[in-house]
């Protein structure tokens, strides 16, 4: 029995020495077993290296083991594998159930127990205890020695969970840590290591559990060889805070203590001196780096070198772009192959997608050495979502996540139709279980009010889709509803998956992925079904005989699947390795690129993790409960990891870092950058900060066809119209693309885009008629939309593009609801033979409350019935509507105008016929619409007409908006009503005005207490109606008989000379009203003509305060951009009312 250290710095050839040593032992011809022990993640590469060194025949005597493989081999020999192995999934599922049962007993973690991730934390610390040979009993025995009460409470909580976990586990199962514990016990009976020679390589530290196994091996083997990455053996001190090899020296000390304890012979160590190191025989610069890194004082490298490069990038993209270019260049100029190169980073998640995108552009084959989580696999999503539907009462998210997996026999169009219906009507929970067909009102789509047959057909389709969705889930629900045993639930879920033919569909997907060269996906799906079955088996194993509901099962499934990762097999031999720095040790690399050499990434920021803080760990160590290292110790390990990473390459080393993140925030380079710059003072740092677009000036820009094509286009774009400025290199490149048919077509397409404009014209009038309908019927609000932007009108009313209707209370929904209640209230007064003068405030409140309640009773699916939140909204609506009707009553009492009509409709089946507008072509356009209220006041044979429009938002009358066609509605309605009234009566109808009535219950803000009547006065004044009024004091006084200088009802005031003040209101004489009527008709005719001649120009308006694009929903469609030729705003000039009146009069006189 003996031990021997094989030591030397990185690159000295320790692994190579071990392989050669094994080769020599084979040639010596003896009966000893030869074993190479390596970490689990390096076992595959170690086997490749061993076979390459000793040949296939040599493997009969020599073998590669990891601790896990060793356990399997020993158990096969002497037994010990009687208990069933439980993996991380089963372990965490069991822990979840234990935590769920005991959460109310916890002192510290009672709240945390409910949070996601707590199971993993507890699992990790239990694993840590086991690795450090701390049992629940040992933990309990040492509790009294802990003085810190907070730490003691933590230990009591964790100890209770640990004990319960171990009690349940030990009956029938073992986990990985228990496996190593049993291995240690069984090694005495094994002959595998009897008189064998063992080489332990690629380790830097061991856990106490692993030390115990090594001790048993040392006591049994002929000799144990242990490689140590360090420059000298000997004493150490923990005060040596700058010692790079401190973690390794601690390992050396622990091994020597074991040897001394067991009287094991310490043989002369093998010192592999670096002069130069085996790895760096071709690079003196890399040799100097490994010798000087973290050495104090260090010696400068006074020569220039191309073996080490530093690149300062603007951002992560230019980092990876530089690396990709250099890889291609290395293959071309340095005779390297892709398999000789690697890209590593301290944050692979951050760089992975970027590397994929850029490397694909450069046609660089790559393999990302990273296990994939399966929680995002579509099979797993389908399973979890199906169970979540039952656990979360058919929530929208779970239902449609289940449907969109693409694994069901449903068309995606049908799923979209169903989703739109569900979202629009707020369908959830028990509504999915309703045996009656859904009959919620379809308040979206292209249906007319009277199109009930088409609507019913659509409803039938939706219910048909719904039934297809429900049937399998309802069957599953009937089989497992209530509290059932875990075994039964898993069996029924398995049957459910088989009925959906998921195994067959997985096979079909594997074939499809292979046929389309998506080998990574084929590899993933070839493993997924076995994982699904394994998770169900683990649940049956640990929870099979326990009864629980869907919530527990759903959590158990998620926890189980979250523990699985799929290893990906490299699809080819010649490809660039992309890896995290922690997985790169055992590869032979000629060119290494380290991306993201920024502060916090390389080295990574060390922060306390898990249950225990650094202070907790130190106190536990003092009380004989040593567990994993604290952040200080981990910082030493991170420092050694940096050293190991920088010295793994044998020819070329490149470090890149970025100066900013995606948001443009500054990032700092790592200390590693400044360290290397100091060691290599003549090293010239490269950068692209001055030319963020790349390297377009020189031959290095010519790369793969895809990338060079983009560079060419960039050059042409920059020098458009100035060909003489283009480098001759790019002229040659241009010719190359012209000579290749595929690229020639693409070049034509891209160059054509330089002259792109988004102007659209429809010259075919037949198409226009198809778009807008054969019958020329339209609403005035649509014409106002056209006036704002013709293209916006075309998209909304021609193409009928609409936002997805959501189950929410939008401003239009709110306005419609309030209009409906006001109409019902007003008609109700008529039916009861009441007038507004008979109404008091209590009557208003009672009637409004009854009306709102009745409407909501008749519409049970209304969003206002959906929650307490909307109950509060309903109460506010009642107050607002009560305020509004009471204010209307006040207006009526103060004036002589009386309501003549409510919700007066213009249309084929309306109160009045459609408004007819004759075009120059002789065609007639019929305008439809609705007026909220028409008031009249009689004076002899004259009838004054006033129309009132209720608005839930703020709306003011602006003459300029009338002039530009943005505010035509009330004027054309007024014109039509005057015309119809003249036909109906013998007298004369005169416009008194058009007004906007604001539906609001404002809050009065004041710094002091004021009486109620003053509050009411302020509210009344804040809700004055505004609009265009007839410039006639007598008529105005009929609207407010109590008016003196100013009115509390309308925004108008009287000057000292008795005339109306124009500064306070918009006024028009009778003549001006007549001119406006003609102007509005003429404007409407012009707008209709433009619509029917196919004008769909992208010409939004713009004034000082806003523009037509401000709230436009279709900007992504029109792509309006003032930088595109022909894209200009229609500037709306700021004119006074006097100027506008002149323009209107001139227009009418033409």
Swiss-Prot record:
Its EC number is 3.1.-.-. The keyword ATP-binding applies. Keywords: 4Fe-4S, ATP-binding, DNA damage, DNA repair, DNA-binding, Exonuclease, Helicase, Hydrolase, Iron, Iron-sulfur, Metal-binding, Nuclease, Nucleotide-binding. Binds 1 [4Fe-4S] cluster. HAMAP family: AddB_type1 (MF_01452). [4Fe-4S] cluster binds at residues 789, 1109, 1112, 1118. It is an enzyme of class 3 (hydrolase). InterPro entries: ADDB_N (IPR049035), DNA_helicase_suAddB (IPR014140), P-loop_NTPase (IPR027417), PDDEXK-like_dom_sf (IPR011604), PDDEXK_AddAB-type (IPR038726). The heterodimer acts as both an ATP-dependent DNA helicase and an ATP-dependent, dual-direction single-stranded exonuclease. Recognizes the chi site generating a DNA molecule suitable for the initiation of homologous recombination. The AddB subunit has 5' -> 3' nuclease activity but not helicase activity. It comes from Clostridium kluyveri (strain NBRC 12016). The keyword Iron-sulfur applies. Despite having conserved helicase domains, this subunit does not have helicase activity. GO terms for biological process: double-strand break repair via homologous recombination. Belongs to the helicase family. AddB/RexB type 1 subfamily. Its cofactor is Mg(2+); [4Fe-4S] cluster. This is ATP-dependent helicase/deoxyribonuclease subunit B. SUPFAM superfamilies: P-loop containing nucleoside triphosphate hydrolases (SSF52540). ATP binds at residues 8-15. GO terms for molecular function: 4 iron, 4 sulfur cluster binding; 5'-3' exonuclease activity; ATP binding; double-stranded DNA binding; helicase activity; metal ion binding. Heterodimer of AddA and AddB. Gene3D superfamilies: 3.90.320.10, 6.10.140.1030, P-loop containing nucleotide triphosphate hydrolases.
